[in-house]
Amino acid sequence: MSVLTPSYQCEPVSLEWGQTWPPRDVFVDLAAERRVIPVVRRVLADELSAVGVYRQLAHGNFGSFILESAEHGGSWGRWSFVGASSAGAIVARDGHAQWIGSHPEGALEEGTFLEVVHSALDALAAPAIEGMPPLTGALVGSLGWGIIPEWEPTLAATAPKESDIPDATLVLATEVAALDHATGSVYLMAIAWNLNGSADGVDGAYDRAIERLDAMTAQLASPIAPAVLGSSGATPPQVRERTARADFESSVNAAKRAIEDGDAFQIVVSQRLDVSTSAS
């Protein structure tokens, strides 16, 4: 994967609450060197959670997501990221990957998963901007077990295909909110992706990014009915196990014997659990 080293280096960014970066002239300079530019506005929203921000901004949009992590001891990490919308996605099934929606010109539209991902990263690679949140534009998604042969061809997929869930999905995020739990700040980001690689339309791209930021700011400030759920009278969902209990215990015992015999030092036996839901 190639890494771009542009000649234009912007200064470290330090935003006050309510401030938007970059100004138009800096955006124009950045557009001459890179195909990914985050237009960012910092707001104070210390009473909001990632789930609350998702409800206000995403509304189940295509390619929306929540990305966060827990630290040791059960506390949340400093950053939570809410993807409100995406321009396109790389979807992989059965050894073949392709873009749906918009994709970067000059990058492979289809191929193996690794070929398509590497091609997109090469086309859109850009250095980080100091002072910005650690995620300001990325491919975000999930990788399933079915994608393992891409890295390790000797582990060919032999299990039957039992669902239509893709082996991997990575979305190209266009609107992201980064919650900084240390300062109570939310960085709203309208990410300008130059998908066609053209120098035309820079001013229009900036204007559209500002319009998107204004809309996100208004959505975040709008009241929303609280989602309060209780268990009183609710029927517990039926959990369906992929593997019968006796078969699962047999696999556990076989794993223990393999470890005792020195054939392995660690084996994790798992199975899929299915629950029906009307959520979307």
Regions inferred by a protein language model and the residue ranges of each:
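Extended alpha-helical targeting/anchoring segments
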Residues: 2-280
